[in-house]
Amino acid sequence: MSRSEELYTKAQISIPGGVNSPVRAFNGVGGSPIFFESAEGAYMIDADGKRYIDYVGSWGPMILGHNHPAVLEATLQAAKRGLSFGTPTEVEITMAETIRKIVPSIEKVRMVNSGTEATMTAIRLARGYTGRDKILKFEGNYHGHADSLLVKAGSGALTLGVPNSPGIPEDFAKHTLTATYNDIESVKQIFAEMGDEIACIIVEPVAGNMNCIPPVDGFLEGLRSICDDHGSVLIFDEVMTGFRVAPGGAQDRYKIKPDLTTLGKVIGGGMPVGAFGGKKEVMDYIAPVGPVYQAGTLSGNPVAMAAGLAALQQLSTPGLYDQLYQRVDTLLDGLQERADRAGVPMTTNRAGSMFGFFFTEEPEVTTYAQATQCNMEHFKTFYHAMLEQGVYLAPSAFEGGFMSAAHSEEDIQNTLNAAEKAFAKLV
């Protein structure tokens, strides 16, 4: 028995399912989860001392790679000054100013502790601002585990086959309307029936929780137009895409300006952080200046702010994003070439430094339905073949991959060599 297997057995005694987030349990691929002990750059080391090229990046935050020296130093120096004060700090102001500079649609921003907190509060704020109860989300989009947002969700909920979680009262769920991602007509139909009751549309501008599915042409533009016509708030959930698919997130990449934006992952540099921000007129509805309440003991934590600020400063390095995009292109073009050569039906998607691949006969995957109809057995076999060769991918066919600035051309080539052997097991 490996050390990871021993730890998993032990963990299940004290922790539900042996994990603190469901997708980590390997239910989507079978077998026991790998326990990790350290990480550096593009690599992680497991409890048995095996090294892996990592394309999960802590589910998105590690865009610079693990243990980046500048982020680590900023974190250590901040920790020496105090782990938490529960008071305003100057670093909060600097973080807010930095976010506003990079994401122009954000005129004011509130820091919280997680992406779930950010989306939960953005929904509450939109309801308070509009005086309406209903919200519209998209099938397969995941916005954290708040009650009103777990209806037909993606990510771990989709991996486990339970997109509607028990424990959510019908009175909550009835206010959550769902449309089809990348199908603007489905949105128009809902708004034609009850547009004056809908407080907001919340969307992953690049769907990253049913693998990686970018928006089709006109989809985000259509959402902006519908919200303008009906007085609804447009919320971009950029917890995953923020600072990753482009310096200013998906709204920068696709040139669409939302009313509110939620952030997380990258802005913490690896520490637990979330944020929501947007138009001044909307943000001024949040307490203490407005009637919509939100609070948090550790919101704006000085150590997390220091880590995130250091990460954002590093992202301004000239050429960094171009390198990320080039690495993704090299990886995905290489994967497609090897899959085609092996006779394995597969297609790939990409958006900035996010990527995904689907085992399917379809020439492209643009919808939730297509993602769920892909060959899951092929994915499981491929996943374990890559794992054996020291390549760590997300243990679910419904999670995308993430490139970091620490990945080298050699890492990409080693990944492609491993993939060639893995594809051979599928024919």
Curated annotation (Swiss-Prot):
Alphabetized PROSITE patterns for the sequence: AA_TRANSFER_CLASS_3
Cofactor or coenzyme needed: pyridoxal 5'-phosphate
Modified residues (N6-(pyridoxal phosphate)lysine): 265
Annotated catalysed reactions: (S)-4-amino-5-oxopentanoate = 5-aminolevulinate
Pfam families according to UniProt: Aminotran_3
Pathway: Porphyrin-containing compound metabolism; protoporphyrin-IX biosynthesis; 5-aminolevulinate from L-glutamyl-tRNA(Glu): step 2/2
UniProt keyword annotations, A-Z: Cytoplasm, Isomerase, Porphyrin biosynthesis, Pyridoxal phosphate
Gene Ontology cellular component terms for the protein in this record: cytoplasm
Compartments (UniProt record): Cytoplasm
GO biological process: protoporphyrinogen IX biosynthetic process
Domain of life, source organism: Bacteria
Record EC number: 5.4.3.8
Molecular function via GO: glutamate-1-semialdehyde 2,1-aminomutase activity; pyridoxal phosphate binding; transaminase activity
Main localization (coarse): cytoplasm
Assembly, per entry: Homodimer.
Family statement: Belongs to the class-III pyridoxal-phosphate-dependent aminotransferase family. HemL subfamily.
PANTHER family for this protein: GLUTAMATE-1-SEMIALDEHYDE 2,1-AMINOMUTASE, GLUTAMATE-1-SEMIALDEHYDE 2,1-AMINOMUTASE 1, CHLOROPLASTIC-RELATED
HAMAP family: HemL_aminotrans_3
Protein name in the entry: Glutamate-1-semialdehyde 2,1-aminomutase
Originating species: Idiomarina loihiensis (strain ATCC BAA-735 / DSM 15497 / L2-TR)
Organism taxonomic ancestry: Bacteria, Pseudomonadati, Pseudomonadota, Gammaproteobacteria, Alteromonadales
Encoding gene, per UniProt annotation: hemL
